[in-house]
């Protein structure tokens, strides 16, 4: 409980392996919308469209790539 990131690897530059907390200044440690410990800017495509669904895009507020609300 209380983990902010996966503390499996001490080599992760975003996560303190001893505390499982994000390092100072880091917003995220992993995810499709995380790049070099920072959230990717809003609107960047993180998952290409399939069929008639539009592309999924980063929100700028999270490391996760949200499912587009048009997905079935």
Swiss-Prot record:
Expression tissues: Expressed by the venom gland.
Disintegrin domain ranges (all copies): 1-72
Keywords: Cell adhesion impairing toxin, Disulfide bond, Hemostasis impairing toxin, Platelet aggregation inhibiting toxin, Secreted, Toxin
Cysteine disulfide links: 5-20, 7-15, 14-37, 28-34, 33-58, 46-65
InterPro entries associated with the record: Disintegrin_CS, Disintegrin_dom, Disintegrin_dom_sf
Top-rank taxon, per record: Eukaryota
Extent of motif Cell attachment site: 50-52
Entry annotated with the keyword Methyltransferase: no
Gene Ontology CC: one annotated term: extracellular region
PROSITE patterns, per database record: DISINTEGRIN_1 (PS00427), DISINTEGRIN_2 (PS50214)
Compartments, as annotated in UniProt: Secreted
GO MF annotation: an example: toxin activity
Subunit structure: Monomer (disintegrin).
Family: Belongs to the venom metalloproteinase (M12B) family. P-II subfamily. P-IIa sub-subfamily.
Role according to the record: Inhibits fibrinogen interaction with platelets. Acts by binding to alpha-IIb/beta-3 (ITGA2B/ITGB3) on the platelet surface and inhibits aggregation induced by ADP, thrombin, platelet-activating factor and collagen.
Miscellaneous information on this protein: The disintegrin belongs to the medium disintegrin subfamily.
Protein name: Disintegrin basilicin
